[in-house]
Amino acid sequence: METLNGPAGGGAPDTKPQPAGQHHRHHHLHPLAERRRLHRAPSPARPFLKDLHTRPATATPSAGRAPTPAAPRSPSLAGKAPPSPGPPAAPGRLSRRSGVVPGAKDKPPPGAGARSAGGAKAVPGTRRAARAGPAEPLSRVGRPTGAEPPPAVAKGRKTKRGPGTPPARAVVPPARASRVPAVTLSVTSVAGCRINHTDSSSDLSDCASEPLSDEQRLLPAASSDAESGTGSSDREPIRGAPTPSSGSRGPPPGSPEPPILLAAPPVASACLGGRSSPGGASTGSPGPGSQEDVGGRAPPERTILGTSKEPSLGEQPRLLVVAEEEELLREMEELRSENDYLKDELDELRAEMEEMRDSYLEEDGYQLQELRRELDRANKNCRILQYRLRKAEQKSLKVAETGQVDGELIRSLEQDLKVAKDVSVRLHHELETVEEKRAKAEDDNETLRQQMIEVEVSRQALQNEVERLRESSLKRRGSREMYKEKKLVNQDDSADLKCQLQFVKEEASLMRKKMAKLGREKDELEQELQKYKSLYGDVDSPLPTGEAGGPPSTREAELKLRLKLVEEEASILGRKIVELEVENRGLKAEMEDIRVQHEREGTGRDHVPSTPTSPFGDSMESSTELRRHLQFVEEEAELLRRSISEIEDHNRQLTHELSKFKFEPHQESGWLGDGVSKGPAASVPLQEELKSARLQIDELSGKVLKLQCENRLLLSNAQRGDLAAHLGLRAPSPRDSDAESDAGKKESDGEEGRLPQPKREGPVGGESDSEDMFEKTSGFGSGKPSEASEPCPAELLRVREDTECLVTIKLEAQRLERTVERLISDTDGFIHDSGLRGNGLASPGVQGGGGEGNSPSEPHLLETINVRMKAFRKELQAFLEQMSRIVDGLSPLSHLTESSSFLSTVTSVSRDSPIGTLGKELGPDLQSKLREQLEWQLNQDRGDEREGLRLRATRELHRRADGDSGSHHGLGGQSCFNLEMEEDHLYALRWKELEMHSLALQNTLHKRTWSDEKNLLQQELRSLKQNIFLFYVKLRWLLKHWRQGKQMEEGGEDLEESEHPENVPGLAELGVQGVHQTDGIDQEDADQGCSLPMGEHAPHSLVQISEHGSRLQSSDGGPLNKQVVENQQLFRALKALLEDFRSELREDEHARLRLQQQYASDKAAWDVEWAVLKCRLEQLEEKTEKSLGELDSSAEGKGALKKEREVHQKLLADSHSLVMDLRWQIHHREKNWNREKVELLERLDSERQEWGRQKEELLWRVEQLQKEKSPRRSGSFLCSRREDDTRPYPHQGSLHSSRPVSMWPCEDADSIPFEDRPLSKLKESDRCSASENLYLDALSLDDDPGDPPPLRNCLAEEEESRKGNLQRAVSVSCMSEFQRLMDVSPFLPEKGLPSAGSKEDVTPPLSPDDLKYIEEFHSNDWDYASPRAEADRPPDPWADRTEMGRVGHEATTEPCPDPSWYLTTSVTMTTDTMTSPEHCQKQPLRTHVLTEQSGVHVLHSPPAIRRVDSIASGGEGRSRADPEGPFPMSRARGNLADAKGGHPEPVLNRWPCTPPRHPRDCVEGSLRPLDRPICPSLGFASPLNSLDMSKNMSDDMKEVAFSVRNAICAGPAEPHVRDMACQTNGSRTAGTQTIQTISVGLQTEALRASGVTSSPHKCLTPKAGGGTTPVSSPSRSLRSRQVAPAIEKVQAKFERTCCSPKYGSPKLQRKPLSKADQPNSRTSPGIPQKGFSESAWARSTTTRESPVHTTINDGLSSLFNIIDHSPIGVRAGSRSRSAEPRQELGPGQETGTSSRGRSPSPLGVGSETFREEGGESTPVRQDLSAPPGYTLTENVARILNKKLLEHALKEERKQASHGSSGLTSDSHTGEPVPAEPGSMEELPCSALAPSLEPCFSRPERPANRRLPSRWAPPSPTASQSQSPGHPMSMEEHGEEDPPEEKPHL
């Protein structure tokens, strides 16, 4: 080994120098190439090299293979470490370099080692050098075997070896040293030079690729070849002998080789070692191989010599003769040189490839850089835009806060817009240019493609030319040689030939060059094309990405090429088809001949007589008949197949549709169509329907499969028949046919039908019948030779088999028909169901309108499927009829074949019979006719499936009859059917068909007309129901107004009872009125309220119960029952209403009669009195005349007396008329009151009993509903029920009697899930009947849902006061609805109301805004309105402030809110502004501090405390102020009115015995005290109190409600208990008639419409003159202001903070009014400021421009209008209250109020910074923490506001305390503003009012904000009261202040 090492070492040095160049050369190539290759080792390239090396090595390995195992590990390891047994270091490198070499190394035995080294070297070289200059390594590797490589390889190896050699030597173990050293040397040198690079890379890359090398090693032969180089394999074969020996010697050769290496010059040995292992050494014996390798490695010559010598010394002497050796060596050298050349070429190619790749990579890199730059630019732009966006957001926030529009911002935005436009234009242009470039590039690409194609063509042409030239030259050469031999003399010719040859050679070289060039160009173009593909997508891709598909021209060209190909293919196929057809014809002819033969034989025999009717007499005819029949059968089968495929397609479609429906159940729910049934219960039937549909579809698919199976069976049977016909003698034996039919049956019956599919798959006459055919043929050939030979039996057999075949076909067709029938029936049923569902045809109770949207699509699909199925069925039937005709017509045979064979015989006969042809001819006609008829019929009515079934049955009967008749004819002995007979038969058939069709059509038409009529009937019924409902509503409205008129006269408030159409049980029951049920609470409240007064209360609960029940039923499929129930309820309600009308008319008549009598008696009395007086006068005159005598003075005295008398007479007449009037009124009222009282009491009793029963029933139903429906709905129903039950009780008692808190549904509102609350009501599907809801809502506006209608009836006064008030808000979703509402609205200006003071109460017609407010409040109030069992409820509900429940609790504490307080919150309405505990807490803090200051003790207590307080106060208020206070129904209104009324008692007195001067005031002022007023200070149970303000009301609403409540309660100034939930300022003005106005900042627009001030803006605008202008209308507000400055103050106060814009709506944060603005507003305090009641907040929320905007929410709920119909006094009071309470309070108090203002709510605490100083104080944004109802934006706004508020609050408080106090005191210094006599007469204007305004300083919308001054001259008080904070001032400045109140968000 040492020697080896030494020599190797020596060799290495020698070699090194030489290889160095090579090595370097390779190396240069190598670093990139090899590294890439190494990394790409796994790629084929490297394996290829390895394989080259490996092959030689492998070949070598005979010797080297033993080592190979070790080598393998070295490959991977060696690559990295010298693990290879060989030289540790070298092996590592070697193995690394040559993934395969390691094997060689390990293999190295003698030659293997060398070769392996060479291979290794070569491999590494190849990888490195070969990668770079693969040729060299390869040549080396290859040369190892050949001596050639030595020069190059030797150099390379030496070079490699040089560096690596020493380590190799040192490391290599002695045994392997020879090989390994060589390897090591070569490898090492390689490693040293190149491998170092490759090693590092190859270490990594090889690791991955080494497996390959290992694999190669594992394949030593291959690997040795590869290692030795490509040449090695060649060489190895040469050295085959040596190799084996070396192989055997392999391991030993290690020693031999070392000697060889030693003997050889060091170079040789080195070369040998290095070379031999890679090259021949390993391949061959160590000697030759090694020598060769060494030679290869060593300088070629030296290596060769040395090697040859050495090998001869070492091994050759033994193996080969020296000459042979030399020859071998020469060959090896040649091979090596060739390998080197090839390697060089490969290197060049590789280099070119690398260059190209590099160029592409560079281009990609440039593109990537460009893209990165673009990305950076885009990022930069994004950053800039983000920055701008942030800036803009900040600015917008700023604008929202300040309310000032940033002109600069607008300008900058405009500039940005211009820039953006420019940029977009520029980008557009750039895009166009880029597009142009792209198009150009595509064109270029196209041209290049064309060029490529041309080049390819030319290249092909050149190749062909070259080939031709080559061939010609060869020929010439041959001929020339012959010529020379023959004619040597002809030198000229030879010279010519030489010249030609030369030319040809030159041409060939030129062509080669051109070819090479073309090849390069082609490669370049291909690469470019690849690049384009990567960029633009594949040209072939069906959908080019972008324009990636390449230019259209290119695609055209490609498509043309493809088209050509396809056309060629088509032509080929066409030719094949033609050939096949020809062949087929030939076969048919042959078969025909055979059949004719058989038939002749058959006719020859006498079996024919046995079948007298058989047309076999003419065998040709019969065969043609059969053939025709078979053809017909095949056509039928084809039709069947097509139909089935269509059915399958449709089935798939249907499945798809169903799956769609499956995932869109809501659409399917449309099928039910009934909005009411749209709940969970409704979805249940839908789901069931879906399930059944899915099942049906599954069945359909199964049946389709069966159909397919049967169809295939039919086809196979037809084939069999065909075969039978063709083969003649043996049709499928009965056994076969039976088996098949059995199989078919099995398939069709069981769904294992798929098993026979293989048979079924074939087309008619396809291979599927091969088995049958085989059976038949085999049976025919072998089974029945005797029959074949015996003509008679054969003929009979044939006939029988034919008939059997026909019978089986018929059976299959019948089975198929049955399946189709089943399918059709199923589909029909499905269509019918879905149609019923979708079109409402089947479910009378269901309205189909909703469902039609979805159902049509699916039923339509099903119908199309059905139509096609029926058409298919028709075809089948026609086919079956033909079969039957054939079979029956041939039935004469039936007696011969009693069994199925009879039919088959008949069939076979029929085939031959003329009938067959006739049938065939007529069949299609019949078929088409039938099909048309069927389709027509189907089109007529797709749903008449049952009728179709009947038809089918009849048809079957007819067919049977026909068959019978046919068989009879046959039996008649007719040997053949006469054409006449057949025609008669067909005629009869057709006649029957026509009859059936006419029947079917009649049926269909009948069904159709019936369904149409039914639909029409249903529609008419619906319209009738709707009309009845409208009639009912209008009647109710009329009745209400009638009663209102009476009440106005009597001062009663009964009218309201009838004002809630909802209360009418019928309404809820009406299908129309589904909505309210969801709103169970509202509806129930309203319904009960109404129904009680009308005696319909019980019906209402019934209605709801029945409604629920009906819902259950409907879900259970009892729509009819539901409709019946609804209709019954409606008629019941109508009946009750008519009864009421009758009673009213009767009373009217009685009153009229009484009046007549009274008039007559009075007139008589007057006449008598007049006569008496006249007498006295005359007497007096006489006396005076006598006394005065002739005095002239007597004349004067007479004149004076006359005048005096006239005056007296006038006075007397006036007094008399007044007395009469009053007496009449008193009479009327007393009568009404007594009657109503009795009626109400009776009704209450009866209804209570009814309720007891209904309650049980309802509970049970609710339980059912809960089970079936969502808990939410059931919960609401339960609550409603509960409430319904309780509600009546309170009313039942005296007015004063407090009703159970839980009495009102609202009371339970808390218990009701939040969702079930009014919001849920609005949300519920019931909402669907919006129009009806509107009616109901509108009707209910005046009715207090909470108020028991009976009470209302009783309280005429209250009702009177209420008349004016729109108590309930209707959710108006659109103007049309609103208009409709207004038309029907009982709340429209009460034209019928007396113009008495009560008229003032009349609310002007509601504006949409008013409606909205009403709606908002209504929702809230409705829930809250009912005196919820809050008092009863534990305070815990308060824990849920966020929950409506909280509100509900508050509400419950209060008796039912007055209708005026129906704050309906639209769904959007914020639920609880105060609900969030934070608000409550915050408020309490502020309020507590300031409460005392305000002078109003505002206790911010937790809802529980509040509840208690309210209860207590309610109790006090009731007892104190309103004996009737207990009646919550009008409480809200009444209380407000009373409060405003100026009489604390009237205020509290809901039913003041004496109508308050302002009935409105009475109504509003007499807020019935809460059963237990929450706030004692509120001594009345203001509806607000009763309202669970926290419930659905937004904070603003709560505030408004609270303020209203306070105002209503405004008793002596009692500390207001501020309802935290309300977040209202509880400041109450304690004027003589001070209304406690609690400024309620409307957090949500909902409060806007609060009854009193509830509509913060216009809605609350008092009807100052009792005018009919909508409350919200500015005029009205101004008027009201004029009427009662005090009220204005109150309103202002109310508006003041309550409406703090902040809370009112985040948007509303008002900006401090400019001082100028504030003073203005202050100046016109006398004019009720819309703002007051509206609350600046609401105004701010409302559209600034709309006059009614106040009512319009900023977007929270455009529908949310609270219409305050409460008397203007009340409204004004509430409004002014918002302003006034502050007035009252004075600066300190005001501060208190403001502080009290719900901190979160707009109380104006901070937000309302009392801007009495002229609004200097910045509005304090109150806490924005929004109640749960708040929208996100509101929350954000609230948060922002909170912070701002807190900050502003501090300042505002300071200001409020200082400036605010001053301002307030100035403006409202408590100067009582004279109010209308009935209104609070002089509410001291407290500073509070001003501060209030600032809170809402956000300017009102200009329309709303008409300056009060505009409307009324501001009174000094008013101006005072109107502090900048006053809503009114705000209103005045609304235009001016907008900035202040701009929405924060």
From Swiss-Prot:
Basic residues bias: start-end ranges: 22-40
Write out the transmembrane intervals: none
Please name the InterPro entries in this protein's record: MTCL1-3, SOGA1/2-like_CC, SOGA_CC
What's an example of a GO molecular-function annotation for this chain?
Answer: protein homodimerization activity
Gene Ontology cellular-component terms for this entry are: apical plasma membrane; apicolateral plasma membrane; cytoplasm; cytoskeleton; extracellular space; kinetochore; lateral plasma membrane; microtubule bundle
Q: Which residues form a coiled coil?
A: 320-396, 424-712, 1120-1196, 1229-1270
Q: Specify residue ranges for compositional bias: Basic and acidic residues.
A: 599-608, 733-762
Which function does this protein serve? Microtubule-associated factor involved in the late phase of epithelial polarization and microtubule dynamics regulation. Plays a role in the development and maintenance of non-centrosomal microtubule bundles at the lateral membrane in polarized epithelial cells. Required for faithful chromosome segregation during mitosis.
Record region (Necessary for self-assembly, microtubule bundling activity and apicobasal microtubule organization): 1-500
Phosphothreonine carried by residues: 613, 1403, 1661, 1669
Which Pfam families does the entry mention? SOGA (PF11365), SOGA1-2-like_CC (PF14818)
Q: Which residues does the annotated region (Necessary for interaction with MARK2 and apicobasal microtubule bundle formation in polarized epithelial cells) include? A: 1257-1368
One GO term of the biological process aspect:
microtubule bundle formation
The gene is: Mtcl1
Q: What is the protein name stated in its UniProt record? A: Microtubule cross-linking factor 1
Q: Which organism is it from?
A: Mus musculus (Mouse)
Composition bias, Polar residues: 610-622, 1717-1726, 1738-1752, 1857-1867
Chain intervals with Pro residues compositional bias = 250-259
